[in-house]
Amino acid sequence: RLAHISGFGVGMFLSAVAIWICSMFELQWNYQWFVIAILCLVLTIPIISSPLEKGSEASIDHASQSNKLSLGFVGISVGYFFFGFGYIIFGTFIAALAVNTPALESIQHASWILVGISAMPAIFIWQAISKLTSNHISLALSCFTCSAGILILYFFDGIAASLFACAAYGMGVVGIVGLVLMEGKIRHSGSIKFAVAFLTTTFSIGQIVGPYISGLMIDFFGDYQNAMLLSGCSLFMAGICMINYKLLFSRL
C-alpha cells in the first residue's frame, strides 16, 4: 500500500531525534550507530510479529515474458538514475553543510527532523495530485519540488533557505519513491519483476556515483555549493525524464 511509504518519513524523523539525543549526551559516532541499530531492531518487531493476510504471500511467475525496453521505460529509468544521483548528494552532505557553516550550525539536527516531518504526509498529497493530473505528471512535480528546494539553498544563504530546502526535499523524495515503481510497471509491458529490478539498478548506480563525484567537487572547490547545484540540476533532469511524452502529446 502507498500509505506504508509514510513510514519512510517516520524513520527519518525517529533517527534524527535519536541522533540529537545522542549528541546531547556527547556519544561518539560508533555509539550513535549502535543506538540506531537497536532502534531498527525494535521497529522490526511489529513487522515480524504481524501475521500475513490470507493470499498476500508472494508468488513467482515462471512464464516467459518479453522484456524489450520501450522508449518510455528507458526514459523513466534514466530519470530514476538522475534522482538517485541528485537526492543522495543532498542527503549525504546537508548535515555536513550545516555543521561547517556557522550560520546553520544551530539547525544541524532540526534539518533532518524537518525532512522526516515533511515526508510523512507527502505520499497522500502526491497521490491526490496524481488523481487530478496523472501519475507521470505527479512524479515529475515531485522531482521539481526537490530540485527547487535545493536550488534555492544554492542561490540564497541562511536558515530560512535551508529549512525550505529540507521541507521540499522530504516532500518530494517520498512522492518519487512512492510513484516511480508504479509508473515503471505501467510503461513496461513485460515482467513486473524485471521492471522493478531494472529501475532499482539504475537508481542504485546513481546513488553510487553521486557521492563520489560530488565529493571530488567539494575537495576541489573547497565548499558544498557546487555539489548542491549539481544535486538540484540532477533532480530537475529527473523530472524532465519522468514525463511520459507519448501520453502527454496524445492528450494535446
What are these regions (language model features)?
Residues 122-134, 218-219:
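Helix-to-loop junctions at the C-terminal end of transmembrane segments
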Residues 43-51, 229-252:
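Multi-pass alpha-helical transporter architecture, strongest
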Residues 72-121:
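Extracytoplasmic gate region of multi-pass secondary transporters
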Residues 23-38, 216-235:
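A membrane-interface helix-boundary motif in multi-pass transporters
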Residues 134-180:
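C-terminal transmembrane helical hairpin of 12-TM major facilitator-type secondary transporters
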Residues 11-23, 95, 126, 209-218:
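Small-residue (Gly/Pro/Ala) motifs that create kinks and tight helix-helix packing interfaces
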Residues 3-52:
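Helix-loop-helix hairpin linking two adjacent transmembrane segments in secondary transporters
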